[in-house]
A protein has these predicted regions:
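Condensing-enzyme catalytic core mediating Claisen C-C bond formation in acyl metabolism
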Residues: 1-42, 50-51
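Conserved beta-strand-centric core segments of catalytic alpha/beta enzyme folds
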Residues: 1, 97-163
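Beta-strand segments within the central parallel beta-sheet cores of soluble alpha/beta enzyme folds
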Residues: 4-12, 47-54, 81-88, 116-123
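Conserved catalytic cysteine-centered active-site region
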Residues: 67-99
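Glycine-rich phosphate/pyrophosphate-binding beta-alpha loops
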Residues: 57-59, 88-95, 148-155
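Stable alpha-helical structural segments in soluble proteins, enriched in small hydrophobic residues
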Residues: 34-42, 69, 73, 105
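Conserved small-residue
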Residues: 9, 49, 54-55, 66, ...
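A glycine- and small-aliphatic-rich helix-loop capping segment at beta-alpha/alpha-beta transitions
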Residues: 26-30, 65-77, 161-163
Length: 163
């Protein structure tokens, strides 16, 4: 048909930490495993990721858990991909959230921009090691890691690439 895809799915990872019926493990252990599983399936390393679409539900426990996982994967290795979340613009789509975020990230890859995190006035000091961007940048990502976490410690990660 001659249609160019918006993005290519390189890999995915899933892991559950079962810490609590409602929340993920406070240290982000399940999300770390899901990210590592996605890297393995995609055949890439953390150094190849230039943008992370965080799950970022704006909850103290959830954001802290995800922040620790991202710190383990990236900051501890002196890597600083751009990180933002589209939820502040779209709201939480509940069971649609990960699909909606995949569409938005695919559009960002195709159109050549990196979405910023809306409505951040003061970044929590515990996230200062992370490269959280607040405004949209007109530089498109090449390799994107997109996180989704759910009740009971369910974690799914997709890795998308510019085709």
């Amino acid at each position: 048909r001659g249609v160019k895809p918006y993005a290519e799915l390189l890999g995915w990872g899933q892991a559950s930490d079962g810490h609590n019926v409602a929340i993920s493990h406070p240290e982000g252990l399940g999300l770390v495993r899901a990210i590592e599983n996605a890297f393995r399936r995609a055949g890439i390393t953390a150094s190849e990721v230039d943008y992370v679409n965080a799950h970022a539900t704006s909850t103290l426990i959830g954001d802290a858990s995800e922040g620790k996982a991202l710190d383990t994967i990236f900051s501890s290795k002196c890597l600083s991909p751009k990180i933002s979340s589209t939820k502040a613009i779209t709201g939480h789509g509940l069971s649609l959230a990960s699909a909606l975020e995949t569409v938005l990230v695919s559009i960002a890859i195709k159109e050549g921009f990196t979405p910023g995190s809306a409505h951040i006035e003061n970044l929590d000091p515990k996230f200062e090691a992370l490269n959280v961007i607040r405004t949209t940048e007109i530089v498109g990502p090449n390799v994107v890691l997109s996180n989704s976490s759910g009740f009971g410690g369910a974690n799914v990660v997709l890795i998308l690439k510019k085709p």
